[in-house]
Amino acid sequence: MEGKKEMGSYKFCLIFTRKFRMTESGPVEDVRDLFEKYTEGDAHMSPEQLQKLMTEEGGEGETSLEEAERIVDEVLRRKHHIAKFTRRNLTLDDFNYYLFSTDLNPPIADQVHQNMDAPLSHYFIFTGHNSYLTGNQLSSNCSELPIADALRRGVRVVELDLWPRGTDDVCVKHGRTLTKEVKLGKCLESIKANAFAISKYPVIITLEDHLTPKLQFKVAKMITQTFGDMLYYHDSQGCQEFPSPEELKEKILISTKPPKEYLEANDTKEKDNGEKGKDSDEDVWGKEPEDLISTQSDLDKVTSSVNDLNQDDEERGSCESDTSCQLQAPEYKRLIAIHAGKPKGGLRMALKVDPNKIRRLSLSEQLLEKAVASYGADVIRFTQKNFLRIYPKGTRFNSSNYKPQIGWMSGAQMIAFNMQGYGRALWLMEGMFRANGGCGYVKKPDFLMDASPNGQDFYPKDNSSPKKTLKVKVCMGDGWLLDFKKTHFDSYSPPDFFVRVGIAGAPVDEVMEKTKIEYDTWTPIWNKEFTFPLAVPELALLRVEVHEHDVNEKDDFGGQTCLPVSEIRQGIRAVPLFNRKGVKYSSTRLLMRFEFV
């Protein structure tokens, strides 16, 4: 960020060369103004002045002088490549370097800071769906590798579908499809090796059990031998409150669900087919980045083969009616810390709270919508003590996902996502769980724990008054030239970047804005401010996408991030961008300013 300029060239029609001035932008006006304000016009900023700036501008209370000195020393070490300093202060360029450093000046904190001593049901939990699949739901391979990847991305709930492999062995696969199986032992070892690599808070394994009592006994032995003292034993059917994440650190919890967890009747299945693709927000945010798993045409080739199997599965319904599927092996039953079942009597009865029992209920994304519309207060009351898991509808063959907001608004702890289903819905999920240090547990807002009879009164209407207003200024961006080839975006010129900025959350809060296009530059400066009034800031996510404008083709993707609004730090911050798969770019970031009013 030194303000240097040099010429860059692009080949045109093979024989012509177009030259562009490649400008490395200096500090933007907001940075210069902030520097002058706290140095009072001096050319250098002392650690004491930086301490005052961080305390007054950051909105996080008192910053210690030791922390300010650490930052000054680190900036000088990195920028000037020297171990000992003749001076201990920052120039304007040094200060700009600090503000643009994603690790020294991040937009959200990277430490666990929420109260972790409440019962487990008081938290949203990062949850995977069919965690063993490498791709689509119909024909992809099953493997232990996606499980390891999910756990290292912060997922705390892993799902395994257990099926007989012959008469004496057990495998993991997506039943009645063409997916290739993987050995259960490999999956268990993968969980053990990766469970607490990123977060020390508990991992829950949900088992979809299609086994005989003999094989249940074998599974119980495998689980016990693999995890040993890591296993947590608990009878959730005889308690009024579940332990806290803090109490369950580095513990593995086993939960079961019925082999078919659907509560829907045939009319719901018909509705599912008719709603395919309805939940997309492409009309507002533009086309979804290209599918990274399977195209629909690829899936159509295997769908017809699977439909007959799935239809037969639907007609048979839950294995609960089959005595061979009951939890008959006592060694297996003893492992179950969180019990799940399919209560009889319909949706209303399923949501009934038993004061002497804690359980987990699973609903499809469509059935959740029905439950919220008809029994919203009951859903919230149920989730204040019990666990509610939401899973993708059956037609998401390509492992796509749904918008998770309706689940969070209803207090559902486990919004089960296909972690290989890259796209905007998964970006939102990853954004939510960047909160609380990325530990995989996020404390639910107080209004979702309100025990009053009218527990759903909080749900915002179109005319809800904002509780808080977030001002966001997109100052500039940098780093693309280090992370991408010079011709990645345009073959004949530097890129033309613009930024989409918006809110995902309560319906009344959802909005999208965008900057103007900055043409022919690798270091675009937008200096565009947006204002977002928020009725439910506790569940709001700030969505940011960078695109490169193309006149005749689809705009190119240039990075994305989602940030929990409740975690955003005030002031000028360096915001790292991620690729379609949620992997952080090495250098690409935005300089943004945040203010709450």
UniProtKB/Swiss-Prot annotation:
Record-annotated EF-hand domain positions: 26-60
SUPFAM superfamilies referenced in this protein's UniProt entry, alphabetically: C2 domain (Calcium/lipid-binding domain, CaLB) (SSF49562), EF-hand (SSF47473), PLC-like phosphodiesterases (SSF51695)
Catalysed reaction equations from the record: a 1,2-diacyl-sn-glycero-3-phospho-(1D-myo-inositol-4,5-bisphosphate) + H2O = 1D-myo-inositol 1,4,5-trisphosphate + a 1,2-diacyl-sn-glycerol + H(+)
Chain ranges of the PI-PLC X-box domain: 114-257
Tissue: Low expression in leaves, roots, flowers and siliques. Expressed in pollen and in cells of the stigma surface.
PROSITE patterns for this protein: C2, PIPLC_X_DOMAIN, PIPLC_Y_DOMAIN
One GO MF term attached to the UniProt entry: phosphatidylinositol-4,5-bisphosphate phospholipase C activity
Gene Ontology CC annotation, any one: cytosol
Active site (record annotation): 129, 174
Extent of Polar residues compositional bias: 293-309
Domain PI-PLC Y-box: 333-449
Region Disordered, annotated ranges: 259-324
Main function: The production of the second messenger molecules diacylglycerol (DAG) and inositol 1,4,5-trisphosphate (IP3) is mediated by activated phosphatidylinositol-specific phospholipase C enzymes.
UniProt name for this protein: Phosphoinositide phospholipase C 4
Organism: Arabidopsis thaliana
Lineage: Eukaryota, Viridiplantae, Streptophyta, Embryophyta, Tracheophyta
Gene that encodes the chain: PLC4
